[in-house]
Amino acid sequence: MKPRVLALDFDGTIAANDTIDADVAAAIQESRDTGLLTVLVTGRTLSDLDARLSGPALFDAIVAENGAVLRLPHLPPITLSRGPDLRFLAELGRHGIPHHRGQCVVDADASVAPQIIQIIRRLELPLSITFNLSRLMVLPHGVDKASGLQEALWRLRASVHNAIAVGNAQNDHEMLEVCEIGAAVAWGSEALRRSADEIVPGDGPGAVARYIRELLALARIPPERMGRRQVRLGTSSTGEPLDLSIRGRTILVGGDPKSGKSWMAGSLCEQLILQRYALCILDPEGDYVCLEALPGVLVYPVDGRDTSFIFLERLMAQPDLSLVLDLSAAPPGDKPALVSRLLRTVNRLRRETGVPHRVLVDEAHYFLNRLDDPRLFDLELGGYLLVTYRITDLSPDVLRASEAVIVTRVDDRRQALALLALTPGIATPSEGLALLADLAIDEAVLLPGSIESGNSSKRFRVAPRLAPHVRHRQKYADVPVRRDREFVFTRAGRPLGRARTIRDLLAALPELPPDVVSGHLERGDFRRWIEEVFGDRELGESIRSLEGGHVANARDGLRRAIADRYGGRAG
């Protein structure tokens, strides 16, 4: 993960006795000079802060009143929740409870919490109490430092997945949780330290300055410092879940053609997208266009002729958008140059902005077989998901950068041995070869070497997909398969016609004699061709339900099923 945002608490974290530590202020300015965004996130009111912050502005945004008020440079304050309920304020006054009010927050001594709870219950108000050391704050439900920070970053066009938060007290829990790394200071709340990703050592705000400068020296947060966010790979034979920490690592997914490797990679993408990571997916064959069914995903066709690369670069820089770059319509000979251009662009953007968070390269052996141009693959930044069926054709530098290896079925001995050579822990080559060849279509194995696998292989059943998946859907709709894999329509053993694409089959069905259609259906020929040549098990199952039915109904059902799946007219 490339740091892009620094979210800092005020009292007890960067400030003591109402004043920001001078060394922390210098470190914050140094971070801004490098392009890091800095956000102050505090329970204090803006008027209170204005009396204590002096000199040039240190922050790109201030989230005040524990997430309820936002200030951006050159703009008036923005309230992110409604103001205090007048009935609530009246009851506080009637009971003589000392308090201070901001634009949205009501602040009081923590000792009066029981009385305030009784007032909230009696008035049936949707209010929450947050404690901060010896004080408490009352705000509407759902308002906290995390919600305020997320609003600030949305307006700054930045992501919590590039953010590091530092805090010291009870009201910092949500902020540390929502950021990619949450750091608690060693001199603060014990409960916060227990839940934090890491601890800032030291005994006062000056230590935060050292922590900031250490971050500035890093192009990427090391994977071992990141482990909270995970994706589900699947389940073991005993039903135990197997998870993989995201950690910004480069992950290699290898396996034979039609073995389920794109399905596996797609499952990882779905989970990352739903955790609001921004992905850039280089999709040579249209395998991942189905991800557009998920929120925040856009499929962008790249054919090299009508592609606006300037507009595409703007899309890539959006922190809340995942892109599937569909190259299936590009001429095969043009794809290496197109992918190289795209990789150079996306790698530069990741260095500059921290997004996209992850880059998937399918059929990676075609595009990363040599690293003559270091801009094609950022070895230092990492964060790639590489999918390949020819591990032997990948650059050795790319292979060495892989930090977790997932394998679907492999029958090719040479490819299997190359995969096994990447990791320790396989007792004998014969044992590893047997394992990889024995995997079912819905199984995979996490090879030894990663933190999660330890020193042994972890075999698992792949987690279900959320979006429908069709292997090479766009390619096989229009691009002819080899002659030896075409569908031959026959009657009494004599050929009547041929189909080399899905659209050929769809166009031929209305013209075929009923007995030819019924014969192929009864023998399961259509289903086997769809499953074995195209690897489309879902459509194959739909066709199975038509086998043995009335010819006219079956023909119409077959045409509808294909048209719904691949596009085109069913009638």
Predicted features along the sequence, with ranges:
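Walker B catalytic acidic pair
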Residues: F10, P284, D362-A364
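Conserved ATP-driven motor cores of ASCE-family P-loop NTPases powering translocation/secretion/packaging/pilus
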Residues: G383, R390-E452
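Short, well-ordered beta-strand core segments
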Residues: S31, I62, G182-A184, I199, ...
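Mg2+-dependent phosphoryl-transfer enzymes with acidic/Ser/Thr/Gly-rich catalytic loops
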Residues: M1-P3, D21, L139, A146-G227
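Terminal, compositionally biased segments used for targeting/anchoring and flexible tails
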Residues: E431-G571
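P-loop NTPase catalytic phosphate-binding loop
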Residues: G227-R358, F367-L385, Y389-D393, V398-A401, ...
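Alpha-helical substrate-recognition element adjacent to the catalytic core
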Residues: M1-R82, V105-V106
